[in-house]
Amino acid sequence: MIHLSQTMDKSSLPSLSDLCMSLVSSRLELFCEMRDDGSLSFREPLVFPQELADQLLCKMATDGVLNDSTVGIFRNCQQFRLRHACIRTARISAEAFHRALCPHRLVELDASRVNADLTIADILRGLSSNKSLQESLQRLVLNGLTMSSLEEPSRRCFSAMQGLRALSVSNVDFYDWGLADVCLLPRLESLDISNTSVSNLTPLLGLRSRLRYLTMHQLKRLEMTTAQLLAVLSQLEVLQHLDISDDKQFTSDVARQLLETPGILPQLVSLDVSGRKQVTDAAVKAFVEARPGMTFVGLLATDAGFSEFLSGEGSLKVTGEANETQICEALRRYSEREGFVREALFHLFSLTHAIEKPRPDILKLVALGMKNHPTTLNVQLAASACVFNLTKQELAFGIPVRLLGNVTQQLLEAMKTFPNHQQLQKNCLLSLCSDRILQEVPFNRFEAAKLVMQWLCNHEDQNMQRMAVAIISILAAKLSTEQTAQLGAELFIVKQLLHIVRQKTCQSTVDATLKFTLSALWNLTDESPTTCRHFIENQGLELFIKVLESFPSESSIQQKVLGLLNNIAEVSELHGELMVQSFLDHIRTLLHSPEVEVSYFAAGILAHLTSRGEKVWTLELTLRNTLLQQLHSAILKWPTPECEMVAYRSFNPFFPLLECFQTPGVQLWAAWAMQHVCSKNAGRYCSMLLEEGGLQHLEAITSHPKTHSDVRRLTESILDGLQRHRARTGYTAIPKTQAHREKCNP
C-alpha cells in the first residue's frame, strides 16, 4: 500500500506532429534496420513531407539521439527531403555529416555546438562537394565550433558557398583572414562575428553595398581605435541592424561616439549597445528620433533605458533593466549570451518577488536561459530563484504542465551539476516542494527522488530537511513498483530516514518533518521486500515500537507507522521478525482504536501474520486464536470512512488473504479493504481489480461453501460495484495473468 494516490495529467497536450516526431525520435529501432556500416535506414519506403523531415532532424538533435548511426536515415533524399537542417549539439563525424546531409539541397544549416571532431572546415568541405548546395544554401550557423584541426589548417574555406546570405560564426576561433574570405561572398547580407578573434574590421568594406545585419558582440581582440571603427561602420551604406554590445569589461566610448555622430547609418532600424559605458537616455533618444524607422535599442547593463520614451512598451522594443518589458525582451534576445542572461535574471528576481498572477510567458524565458547555460552557476542560481518566485503556491496552477515539466527537469539538471552549492540546492528544493509540480507535472521522479535523498544525507538544515522529506514522501508514491524497490534498495536512504525518525522520537517532537519522513518510509517499503529487509536490519521495528510508545495519542503518527508495518507484514520471509509479544501487544491495543484509520492498519498487520497458519505461528496458539476473534469483531464495528484513507498500487497482496477460509477474519479484512477503495474511487480501483483478475477471485469466494456470511456479504457488495462499473464504462479488458502468492494454511 502507498500513502498517496496518483493523479492524471490531462492538460497542456502537445500537438499531434510533436507527438509523432517524439515517438519516431525515441523509437527509431522500431522503424529502422541497420546497414553494414552501422547506420540506420527506414525499413518501409515512407516519404516524409519536407517540413516533417526538417522537424524530425531537429527533434533528434534536441533529444540528443542524433549520431553517426541515426543520422543515416537522412541519406535517402527521396524519403527525407531536407531544406532547413538543425543539428545543434549533435555528435556526428565528418563522414556521417557528408553522407547524410550534404546530398540535400539545403537552404539553411544550423550546426551550432556540434562535437569538436566536426570542424568548420569539415562542414564547408562537405557542403561544397555538392554544386547545387553551394548555390542553394542561404543561411549557415556555425556558432561555437572549431575552425579546423591542427593537422589541417584551412584558409579561404568559405568562398565556395556562393549562395550564402547569412553567416554566423560567434564563439569561434575566427581570425582576420577568415573575415577577409567571408567578405568576398557575393550575396552576403548578414554576418555575426561575436566573440571571435577578429582584430580589424576593414574587410567589411567589401560588403558596404549589401551588408544589412552586423553583429559583433564582445569583440575582445579588436585593435582599432574608436575613430577607425566608426570610419568603417559609417561606410556600410545599407546597414539596418548593428550590434556592438559588450559584457561591461571594457571602457571604450564607441557607443557614446556612435550615438553622437550626426547622420551616421541613416537606414539603421536596430542598434544594440548593451553593456557599453557612457550611454545616456538623452543621447539614445536623439539618435532614435533622427531615425524614425527604428524598432529596437539594446540597453541592458547600461545607464540608459529609464525614461518613458525608452520604456519598451510601444513600437520601439528595448532591452534593459528598468521594467518587466525590457527584462523579458533581454531574456528573449540574449538567451545564448551568458553574461546578459545572468544580468537579466538578476533584475527579474527582484521584479517577481511579489508577483500575484501566473506568468508562463516569463517562466518560459527563464527555462530557456537555464537550458542554454547548464554549467554556468550564476545563471542557474538566479534562474532557480526566479523559478521559485514564478511557481510558488497557487501560481503553479496557472502554468501549463508541459512548461512546468520542462522547468522541473532543468532544476534537476542544476541540482545534479552543482551538488555542493547549498543555495542552489535550496532554491531547487523550494520550487520542487509544490503540490502542483509533485502531483501533476511530468518529469523524471525517480531521478528527482535520488537527488533529493542525496541532499538530505549531506545536510542538517532543519527547514530544508522538512521540505526534502516532504518531496520524497510524495515522489515515492508516484514511482513504479520497480523504481520504488530500486530507490529503497539503496541502504543509505533507509538509514537516513530512520535517523530522522530517531532524532524526532528522542526529542519527543511531532512535526511535519517526522510525518513526512514516516510517509516516505511507508511509500518506499510498498511492495519492496528489499527495502523492508533494510528496515528490519537497521532496527526499524524496535524504533517504530518506540515511536508508538512515545506518541500514544497521535493518531496520524500511528496511522503512518502501522501503514509501513503493513508493508513489512506482506513479506512472508519477515514474519518471524514480527513475532514479538511486546509488538503484538501494541498492535492489539491499536486494533481497538476509535480511529478507523488506525484500527484498519493494525488489523492488516494481524491479518497478514495470522494468514500463514498455525505451523508458522511461533507464539502461543491461544494468542493467535484470540487475535483472530478480535480482528473479526473489530472489522464489523468499523464505520464507513468519509474519504479514501489509503491508496494501493495493486490488489495482488490481497488475493492470498481471500483464500484463507479457515480464518474468516483475515478474509474479512482483505474484502473490507477492497470494498473501501473500490467504493471511494471506482474509476481507478474497479478497473484495477478487473484487470488483475479480481472478479474470478471474488466469484470463487461467494460460491465457496466455507465462506463466512460476513465475508460473503462484503464480496457480493464488491461484485455489485464491479458490475455497475462495467455497465457504466463498458470495461472489457482481459485480466492480466498473475502469479499466485503462497496460499493460506489453517
From Swiss-Prot:
Disulfide bonds: none annotated. SMART domains: ARM. One of its GO terms (biological process) is cranial skeletal system development. LRR repeats lie at residues 185-209, 216-241, 265-289. It comes from the Eukaryota. Coiled coil: none annotated. Belongs to the zyg-11 family. Serves as substrate adapter subunit in an E3 ubiquitin ligase complex zyg11-cul2-elongin BC. Targets substrates bearing N-terminal glycine degrons for proteasomal degradation. This is Protein zyg-11 homolog. The lineage of its organism: Eukaryota, Metazoa, Chordata, Craniata, Vertebrata.
